[in-house]
Curated annotation (Swiss-Prot):
Keywords: Cytolysis, Hemolysis, Host cell membrane, Host membrane, Lipid-binding, Membrane, Secreted, Signal, Toxin, Transmembrane, Transmembrane beta strand, Virulence. A cholesterol-dependent toxin that causes cytolysis by forming pores in cholesterol containing host membranes. After binding to target membranes, the protein undergoes a major conformation change, leading to its insertion in the host membrane and formation of an oligomeric pore complex. Cholesterol is required for binding to host membranes, membrane insertion and pore formation; cholesterol binding is mediated by a Thr-Leu pair in the C-terminus. Acts as a major virulence factor required for the escape of bacteria from phagosomal vacuoles and entry into the host cytosol. The keyword Secreted applies. GO terms for biological process: killing of cells of another organism. Homooligomeric pore complex of 35 to 50 subunits; when inserted in the host membrane. Gene3D superfamilies: 3.30.1040.20, Perfringolysin (3.40.30.40), Perfringolysin, domain 4 (2.60.40.1430), Thiol-activated cytolysin superfamily/Thiol-activated cytolysin, alpha-beta domain (3.90.840.10). Activity of listeriolysin O is regulated on multiple levels. It should be high in the phagosome, thereby allowing escape of the bacteria from the phagosomal compartment. Then, once inside the host cytosol, the activity must be controlled to prevent lysis of the host plasma membrane and loss of the intracellular environment. This is Listeriolysin O. Belongs to the cholesterol-dependent cytolysin family. Disulfide bonds: none annotated. The lineage of its organism: Bacteria, Bacillati, Bacillota, Bacilli, Bacillales. GO terms for cellular component: extracellular region; host cell plasma membrane; membrane. Residues 1-24 form the signal peptide.
Length: 529
């Protein structure tokens, strides 16, 4: 389904009336397995000569970091909630509907190589930053090592840049120097190449998840979701009660990636005066191994919350159609869900005026939000939206393993119905109409109560009409009618005997004819699915 969604979204973006540059496909190529960049990292700048003492310090740093004993698969792990008790099934009356709420235990396991960036921590995120690979990195609060730095090489993947124009050497890799270098690369492209590539299509990354718990969504989208949800305000309470269905979508439009050279040895990322003892004093050890931000994606990040109070099982399909722009004109149920749903968007980047935007609207307006920022230019500047980290020990990718258990809540609405009786026959008739009403005890077990119409077995002369109103939890409906023939050997004759009928909005039972030739019909208006 996600692949289909990605195709639909791509079609939306390429349908914009913009000139397509010659090499747009190179700029918009996207490798799903490696969000940040698929290009090779730049080569390291030449090492400057070291004094014997500096070489000794460098060798000691290399030996210490390369000797750290840790399992890279267990360093960065997020453990979410553990579910021990699953609440029982329950039902309740809500207006003209009976709602049945069911809960199931579910789990999610997600490996994330990319870490999402939100505005609160963007100042900590820059290519080449040295960080500790520990729980703070998992929590998206990277602990940057405050040490002197050596030079490093940055490269950018904007199209057309030749003759090493896409690379720059930062001699002293501080945060400000690196950010200035990134700005220099972007401005270089704007001045020399932007005219030849007027509309660089953003690379798209799309992911979605129906919402049930905050822990589940953190495992799905990373701990940055905590900050995002301060604005999205996912209504977990209403979701848990079965009164609302909500979906969260992460939609990235990546304009360019900035990559960092892989160091040939760990000490190449440190200034000449840095010692092993300084790193140890800063807490660098096997529990907090050093890592570096190897690549940063710049662009526009949109988080969406889609909301509806529908109990339909087609809500996910309706949301997918709204996001992709797929027509649902032939499906009344999907059309009604979209019409009666809303969205909230939190947007980072893509605007020269506001870095963060919060927008509320109807699903019909959603495509306009996704179309904006589809291309990179001076008017749609990119901000850091995601980054990857590598272990300094061996340049291996540092992957965050997220897992959580959660309760999936589903609800189904059963609409009230009625039986309309019409007796126009030339005889005395008696009816017997019964049904079962289903409820649930505190443990979630079904409680079945048998119900009978108050006019059962009472003689009715033509013309007689009546309506029997049935609640949404009515099941196993039985309709029986007999007529008096006046014959001594067959005083009563069955006219209709229909059993175990489903609940419908309007069931019309008609009987007519004579004592010897009675007739009946059982028809349905607007059946309830």
């Amino acid at each position: 389904m996600k692949k289909i969604m990605l195709v639909f979204i791509t079609l939306i973006l390429v349908s914009l009336p913009i000139a397509q540059q010659t090499e747009a496909k190179d700029a918009s190529a996207f490798n799903k397995e490696n969000l940040i960049s698929s290009i090779a990292p730049p080569a390291s700048p030449p090492a400057s000569p070291k004094t014997p003492i500096e070489k000794k310090h460098a060798d000691e740093i290399d030996k210490y970091i390369q000797g750290l004993d840790y399992n890279k698969n267990n360093v960065l792990v997020y453990h979410g909630d553990a579910v021990t008790n699953v609440p029982p099934r329950k039902g309740y009356k809500d207006g003209n509907e009976y709602i049945v709420v069911e809960k199931k235990k579910k789990s999610i396991n997600q490996n994330n190589a990319d870490i999402q960036v939100v505005n609160a921590i963007s100042s900590l995120t820059y290519p080449g930053a040295l960080v500790k690979a520990n729980s703070e990195l998992v929590e998206n609060q990277p602990d940057v090592l405050p040490v002197k730095r050596d030079s490093l090489t940055l490269s950018i993947d904007l199209p057309g840049m030749t003759n090493q124009d896409n690379k720059i050497v930062v001699k002293n890799a501080t945060k400000s120097n690196v950010n200035n270098a990134v700005n220099t690369l972007v401005e270089r492209w704007n001045e020399k190449y932007a005219q030849a590539y007027p509309n660089v299509s953003a690379k798209i990354d799309y992911d979605d998840e129906m919402a049930y718990s905050e822990s589940q969504l953190i495992a799905k989208f990373g701990t940055a979701f905590k900050a995002v949800n301060n604005s999205l305000n996912v209504n977990f309470g209403a979701i848990s009660e079965g009164k609302m269905q909500e979906e969260v979508i992460s939609f990235k439009q990546i304009y360019y990636n900035v990559n960092v050279n892989e160091p040939t040895r760990p000490s190449r990322f440190f200034g000449k005066a840095v010692t092993k003892e300084q790193l140890q004093a800063l807490g660098v050890n096997a529990e907090n191994p050093p890592a570096y931000i190897s690549s940063v994606a710049y662009g526009r990040q949109v988080y969406l919350k889609l909301s509806t109070n529908s109990h339909s099982t087609k809500v996910k399909a309706a949301f997918d159609a709204a996001v992709s722009g797929k027509s649902v004109s032939g499906d009344v149920e999907l059309t009604n869900i979209i019409k009666n749903s809303s969205f909230k968007a939190v947007i980072y980047g893509g605007s020269a005026k506001d870095e963060v935007q919060i927008i509320d609207g109807n699903l019909g307006d959603l495509r306009d939000i996704l179309k904006k920022g589809a291309t990179f230019n001076r008017e749609t500047p990119g901000v850091p939206i995601a980054y990857t980290t590598n272990f300094l020990k061996d340049n291996e990718l540092a992957v965050i393993k997220n897992n959580s258990e959660y309760i999936e809540t589903t609800s189904k609405a059963y609409t009230d119905g009625k039986i309309n009786i019409d007796h126009s026959g030339g005889y005395v008739a008696q009816f017997n109409i019964s049904w079962d009403e289903i409820n649930y005890d505190p443990e979630g077990n079904e409680i079945v109560q048998h119900k009978n119409w108050s006019e059962n077995n009472k003689s009715k002369l033509a013309h007689f009409t009546s309506s029997i109103y049935l609640p949404g939890n009515a099941r196993n409906i039985n309709v029986y009618a007999k007529e008096c023939t006046g014959l001594a050997w067959e005083w009563w004759r069955t006219v209709i005997d229909d059993r175990n009928l489903p609940l419908v909005k309007n069931r019309n039972i008609s009987i007519w004819g004579t004592t010897l030739y009675p007739k009946y019909s059982n028809s349905v208006d607007n059946p309830i699915e």
